[in-house]
Amino acid sequence: MSGNNSSLSYKDAGVDIDAGNALVDRIKGAVKRTRRPEVMGGIGGFGALCELPTKYKQPVLVSGTDGVGTKLRLALDMNKHDTIGVDLVAMCVNDLIVQGAEPLFFLDYYATGKLDVDTAADVVSGIADGCVQAGCALIGGETAEMPGMYEGEDYDVAGFCVGVVEKEDVIDGTKVAAGDALIAVGSSGPHSNGYSLIRKILEVSGADKNEELAGRTIGEHLLEPTKIYIKSALKMIEKHDIHAISHITGGGFWENIPRVLLEGTKAVIDGNSWEWPIIFKWLQEKGNVETHEMYRTFNCGVGLVVALPKDQADAAVALLKEEGENAWVIGEIAQAEANEEQVEIQ
């Protein structure tokens, strides 16, 4: 036995159970405001229960998981944590809507070296805000305090979401055809992708995050939360024959649009159909980033690209605008030759 007779505790090892309990008490109100009628029970159980909505005849569950990448580093540097949870929810639920799914419930994982209750409560409050926007319930989560794994009060977050769609209404891209119109739905900024390049641009250029750009600081532009498209997109899906939806995330246009296209088709994008939001122009200028690389890394102002019959495009754009979205016709689907790139930006 060791010569040290003092009694050790979990807290001595760097894990504060009392802080964890305090966090649970703090977030109960936030969780409650996300509740859906299908949710059974409250938080704190070993598992969370949720019934399927009764309106579905042949329900298909759609799942997704994601994080927010190195946008977290920016939030930590700026000590602003109340919207990063919105980003987390958005990155998950926007992937579900691509297949026509209505988000049902969401769970989060929060890992840190030393739990700061105020910071964690801000993050969870943001998650609840995102769930309210998406119409899904925050039904559970995990907070892991792991001394030695993370530096100080640094943290990481991950999210997991489950949605539901009628089997016959699954959007899988199989209806995409040459002649379809492509609609863009505007983004709120870089969303949660490309932040390693953004941080490199800030470092190399020596730019000040407090510098003003179009009435806001650079930092405010960069921490603008990811737009959640669920409610407007569900209305569009209800009214129109949607052939495919692409969520423009990591990999930009070149990587994400081909994921929903059939072999032998390509997306022809009119690069003059919209003006990049000013933050993307600033990033390109400060980082001397080539235009192709911008489209490969960032959404450049486009959060979703939607394929649908050409004769429905104008009505769909009008509906999206009524729902508060910035939407426009951005291009069309065309036939592609063998081995031809599936995205062409003119």
From Swiss-Prot:
Gene3D superfamilies: PurM-like C-terminal domain (3.90.650.10), PurM-like, N-terminal domain (3.30.1330.10). GO terms for molecular function: ATP binding; phosphoribosylamine-glycine ligase activity; phosphoribosylformylglycinamidine cyclo-ligase activity. Its main location: cytoplasm. Its EC number is 6.3.3.1. InterPro entries: PurM-like_C_dom (IPR010918), PurM-like_C_sf (IPR036676), PurM-like_N (IPR016188), PurM-like_N_sf (IPR036921), PurM_cligase (IPR004733). Keywords: ATP-binding, Cytoplasm, Ligase, Nucleotide-binding, Purine biosynthesis. GO terms for biological process: 'de novo' IMP biosynthetic process; adenine biosynthetic process. It is found in: Cytoplasm. It catalyses: 2-formamido-N(1)-(5-O-phospho-beta-D-ribosyl)acetamidine + ATP = 5-amino-1-(5-phospho-beta-D-ribosyl)imidazole + ADP + phosphate + H(+). The keyword Cytoplasm applies. It is an enzyme of class 6 (ligase). GO terms for cellular component: cytosol. Pathway: Purine metabolism; IMP biosynthesis via de novo pathway; 5-amino-1-(5-phospho-D-ribosyl)imidazole from N(2)-formyl-N(1)-(5-phospho-D-ribosyl)glycinamide: step 2/2. It holds the Pfam family AIRS. Belongs to the AIR synthase family. NCBIfam families: purM. This is Phosphoribosylformylglycinamidine cyclo-ligase.
